[in-house]
């Protein structure tokens, strides 16, 4: 292996000061135009703008949950708010010598540990901080600046044992508890080109080394259990992104950089190649934004963005068949026993796109059931594809977005009925 493993109350929002509005029932949103199925809006909190916000894998649109709180990052740092009331609980401490928050792990570990990356100076997103998501307490921090240029798109993932990063020229894993370096990625030769996929469970590396044998190779390493690893000789597709751990699903590409051919490649739990699907024909319109991509292990279905209007579509991962596609703008909120929960401005019923709807979608048949309308008197919500949305186990829907009227960013909580 080429890897070395040692493995009713209102708090006013003043300029620059965060606050929240707690709504009593639906009284704050009363009005003649209110739809009968309008979802109950529970609270709204300010979310100061950050230049780091975006839909990339580790941008400041991640939302974490613990037992009671929602945790998100913005221009004022990473903070926890009570999910029911919107009251702020804590803020992650900025390490000494660090600046604003750059990035967060897409999710915390099952044990409630998350990773945050701060600006280490000079717009270099290299200061790693690992936190307890129940208390906001910093477990450890590490400045990973390496003097080889500023890092603008750090990647960081967390599991029960390891915090893994690609920051600058550091491709490494650190123990969750103390931050000791437990593995480091090293090249197989002196003349190599590499592409890397990083996820909470796996490190995937495709290497093409003219001075090594085999010249081309895919290496898969389980990040929790160092004894679980495999190699695939002759792999010549470069890794674009890891889409899922269960099953391990890679988006890969080959051909020219100007017009590459993309593939979906899946692997067994033993690290052996399973299915490879070339994205041609209708499948070429699939878009794999990290926050709008979902893989269902049981159904073997992949859901991703689709088309020029930022809709959604589902593909059978065994056959490559496109199962369904949704027009308009849509965003994935989560999955529960009712199906895939999405926010859309263009439901299958053809309803008006003035107010976004929360809809459950059957994974295989694409059938929709409207759960309610996202209603605001001011109609300030943007298109779903411009929101970040997350659904918790209590069917509370959280939306990070900027108001259409004044571009003021904030977070809102809506209650979605189970029935």
Predicted segments with their positions:
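Repeat-blade elements of multi-bladed beta-propeller folds
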Residues: 1, 55-72, 100-128, 149-167, ...
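Long, leucine/valine-rich, helix-dominated scaffolding and oligomerization segments
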Residues: 174, 184, 214-217
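Aromatic (tryptophan-biased) beta-strands that constitute blades/sheets of beta-rich domains
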Residues: 21-69, 76-102, 132, 137-146, ...
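Asp-box/WD-like beta-propeller blade repeats and closely related beta-sheet repeat scaffolds
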Residues: 138-162, 168-170, 177, 181-193
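Hydrophobic single-pass membrane-targeting/anchoring helices
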Residues: 1-36, 394-399
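Flexible, glycine-rich surface segments
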Residues: 310-313, 323-331
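Beta-propeller blade signature
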Residues: 128-136, 215-224, 263-270, 314-316, ...
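Hydrophobic, structured segments
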Residues: 221-223, 231, 266-267, 274-282, ...
